[in-house]
């Protein structure tokens, strides 16, 4: 009997036998081996020559051994959700089916994370990203930022698509743990589905739009005006006076752009006009960075995807808890860096004390009023960032006070440690656990999907304004006729005059 030739056994048998060896690799490496690596490994270890298609099937077989089939993952989802709530008290999970009883939505918010949010600045960035597995779908995420400016995940949902109904369902779940309030801020892209859902579920909260998405929207029409840096500066301005100095310049140079920005509502994109404090969170980067981190897990069955998120959060909570315990400074490491970077400029200012807590601080051209007790400066940086500006630092140094004492409680090391004080626990092995009878009654089949023609996408389409690294495949290209992006000289319809 021959054991070392491809003809000695059927294709499927090769996949099952060799899949065991890749199975071992998958335990040590999240993404497993690439098909080309599998071809080489099988040739070297077993003397069997397989082609790329067979190697791909080997990889799929190995992933099934590790993670189960995508179909089984949906059937077992109710068990996984139950175990998470059992091992992590205060967690919230939901599962929703369609009219045919098939999976439609799933929601997860871990109790330790939700409780930790009560110690943080009340700004939540939300974003969605498509899933790349057999049944497609979309992952919705809500994230905050901790006192050390780290990403802090709050809630997730797997839904059929990113639309008004799914966002409303997601926000309804989130509102069970984070109620509506006037000091709560959501930051997102300009999708109408998010806006309408927030208006319905969180009417008291403020909805701000991401500065980067605003710039992407105006790039196709106004990039050649050279005013995009001014728009960015206007969005980031701390005072209305500073905002209007910049906006007047925009209006004088391009009235059409100024009109568009006015119609976009200053309160949504300009920090100085926001009715609730956005602090430093002017973009959805914290949510998008999470989606980027989950690039590979988005291909996995639903339980493996959610388990990857859980494991990531478990690791983050442990590592950051340890880091906070070792950090001996009053304020978090990133805030220490900010204050140190401002110290040099602060020492060049002239300070005049008005009373016990009020000071007049002057530079070469302007003067500012600082009230250390009220944690206020007329530059508004102290008020919004909740960290002493250069003027407040100068005032504190003038009376020999430690500027760290005037940092907001959300940035204290003690608060940072409390946010990660609890652990996020694994749910345990599903096959050996016991469950209440009603849990298996909630089991549902996977969603019905319509397979699209052609190869399924693994990358989202980039919007205008997302430029690649020079020399890379993702680099943007400009029309050789008119010099703008988005088309080539063959399809160019711009008048040249």
Where are these regions (language model features)?
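Hydrophobic, aromatic-enriched, well-ordered structural segments
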Residues: 51, 64-72, 76-117, 175, ...
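Cysteine-centered loop/knuckle micro-motif
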Residues: 55, 389, 489-494
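Basic, short loop/linker segments at the boundary and entry of helix-turn-helix/winged-helix-like folds
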Residues: 1-32, 456-458, 463-464, 469-473
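Two-metal-ion RNase H-like nuclease active-site motif
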Residues: 108-112, 120-131
């Amino acid at each position: 009997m021959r054991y070392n030739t491809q003809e000695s056994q059927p294709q499927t048998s090769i996949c099952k036998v060799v899949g065991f060896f890749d199975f071992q690799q998958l335990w040590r490496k999240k993404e497993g081996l690439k098909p080309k690596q599998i071809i080489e490994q099988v040739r070297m270890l077993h003397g069997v020559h397989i082609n790329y298609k067979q190697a791909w099937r080997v990889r799929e077989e190995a992933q099934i051994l590790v993670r189960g089939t995508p179909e089984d993952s949906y059937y077992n989802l109710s068990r996984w959700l139950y175990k998470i709530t059992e091992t992590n008290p205060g967690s919230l999970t939901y599962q929703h089916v369609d009219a045919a009883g098939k999976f439609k939505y799933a929601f997860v918010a871990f109790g330790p994370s939700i409780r930790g949010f009560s110690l943080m600045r009340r700004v939540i960035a939300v974003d969605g990203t498509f899933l790349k597995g057999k049944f497609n779908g979309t992952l919705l995420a809500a994230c905050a930022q901790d006192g050390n400016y780290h990403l802090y995940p709050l809630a997730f949902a797997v839904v059929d698509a990113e639309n008004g109904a799914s966002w409303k369902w997601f926000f309804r779940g989130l509102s069970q743990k984070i109620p509506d309030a006037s000091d709560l801020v959501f930051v997102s892209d300009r999708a109408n589905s998010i806006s309408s859902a927030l208006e319905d579920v969180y009417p008291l909260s403020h909805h701000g739009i991401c500065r980067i998405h605003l710039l992407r929207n105006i790039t196709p029409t106004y990039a050649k005006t050279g005013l995009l840096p001014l728009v960015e500066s206007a969005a980031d301005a701390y005072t209305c006076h500073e905002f209007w100095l910049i906006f007047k310049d925009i209006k004088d140079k391009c009235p059409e752009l100024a009109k568009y920005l006015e119609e976009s509502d200053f309160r949504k994109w300009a920090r100085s006009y926001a009715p609730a404090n956005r602090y430093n969170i002017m973009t959805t980067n914290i949510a998008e960075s999470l989606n980027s981190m989950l690039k590979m897990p988005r291909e996995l069955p639903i339980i493996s995807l959610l388990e990857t998120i859980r494991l990531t959060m478990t690791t983050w909570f442990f590592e950051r808890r340890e880091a906070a315990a070792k950090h001996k400074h009053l304020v978090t490491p990133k805030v220490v860096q900010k204050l140190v970077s401002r110290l040099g400029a602060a020492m060049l200012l002239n300070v005049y004390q008005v009373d016990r807590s009020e000071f007049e601080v002057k530079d070469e051209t302007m003067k500012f009023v600082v009230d250390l007790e009220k944690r206020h400066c007329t530059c508004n940086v102290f008020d919004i960032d909740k960290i002493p500006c250069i003027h407040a630092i100068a005032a504190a140094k003038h009376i020999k006070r430690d500027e760290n004492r005037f940092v907001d409680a959300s940035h204290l090391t003690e608060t940072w440690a409390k946010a990660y004080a609890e652990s996020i626990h694994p749910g345990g092995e599903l096959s050996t656990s016991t469950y209440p009878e009603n849990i298996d009654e909630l089991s549902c089949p996977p969603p019905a999907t319509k397979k699209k023609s052609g190869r399924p996408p693994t990358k989202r389409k980039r919007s205008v304004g997302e430029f690649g690294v020079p020399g890379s495949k993702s680099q943007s290209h400009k029309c050789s006729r008119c010099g703008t992006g988005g088309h080539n000289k063959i399809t160019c319809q711009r008048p040249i005059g």
